[in-house]
UniProtKB/Swiss-Prot annotation:
This is Cytochrome b. Heme b b566 binds at H98, H197. Gene3D superfamilies: Cytochrome Bc1 Complex, Chain C. A ubiquinone binds at H202. InterPro entries: Cyt_b/b6_C (IPR005798), Cyt_b/b6_C_sf (IPR036150), Cyt_b/b6_N (IPR005797), Cytb/b6-like_sf (IPR027387), Cytochrome_b (IPR030689), Cytochrome_b_C_euk/bac (IPR048260), Cytochrome_b_N_euk/bac (IPR048259), Di-haem_cyt_TM (IPR016174). Its cofactor is heme b. It is a multi-pass membrane protein. GO terms for molecular function: metal ion binding; ubiquinol-cytochrome-c reductase activity. The lineage of its organism: Eukaryota, Metazoa, Chordata, Craniata, Vertebrata.
Amino acid sequence: MATNLRKTHPMMKIINNLVIDLPSPSNISAWWNFGSLLATCLALQIITGIFLAMHYSPDISMAFSSIAHITRDVQYGWLIRNMHANGASLFFMCIYLHIGRGIYYGSYLYKETWNTGIILLLLVMATAFVGYVLPWGQMSFWGATVITNLLSAIPYIGNTLVQWIWGGFSVDNATLTRFFTFHFLLPFAITGLTAVHLLFLHETGSNNPTGLNSNTDKIPFHPYFSYKDLLGLILMLTFLLTLTLFSPYLLGDPDNFTPANPLSTPPHIKPEWYFLFAYAILRSIPNKLGGVLALLFSILILFLMPTLHTSKQRTASFRPLTQILFWSLVADLLVLTWIGGQPVEDPFIIIGQVASTFYFLILLLLMPAAGMIENKMLNLK
């Protein structure tokens, strides 16, 4: 009998166990598609990014012009650039939906997978931030100045640290060069950590919408979920191409069409839409250090999710109180995103403060309390 190369070859055996013969729960829904979509986003960003790096000049006198050159003169440069910029937005849409799925269905109880996932989120956020500085427009420059300047709130070493990151006394050529270096380097670190993330996931297997052990009811990944993922992939790429070809600058900031000018501050400094919720939390605290800590904790709070899980049931599928709180959290994050893009004036200040308080209240207090109440109601000791 001929041996199956797919199952015996050292290299193909790994791929086989990863995407072909992988035992998967039979009832996982479309919410489980986002892992493969994120991998696709990452591949797309690396490919388009490498082509952009071929034509980009990381120098303050040429950066803005080189972006204009890519858009105007390079073959399909406009497409590559717009796919890269909007691909980042799509990356964050997928990552937030992926995390939301994890919170709703209790996937965070796979602690190693969850923790590597949060580190991946932090790396993706860092990559997006340094990448936003590269076009050297007004919002790039002032965004970099404001966000890096937050580190000066750290007692004793703050100012030294900021100057060390800047490579001088202000955001300048040295800053742009190092940000380009990190923007090129980090996606490869993300790729490596993604492999670790998958390694930990495949130690336990996927969770499912019921939260019950699915070992008695597994099906092979291929053809069932490979085709299901392919459908999600086609829908995602259709959305990306529609956005890129019809409204490429919809999610960008008009200020970035103006070259960076250290002598002129834009009226409203704000980051890209995917950071607005964290920016709103930062601004809602009148104290600089307090704001920075709130900003940090708004992401790092995710590390506490397994500890804060009090329910005897894993998912929120059969827990109405937790469902109400989860969707309240989603609504709260949408409010924070809206507030982050508004000027610092009434009534936006108080709305931001209330929404920020609710964000931490839901995650730290109300969700654990709801879990305990539901246990009591169901007589689960």
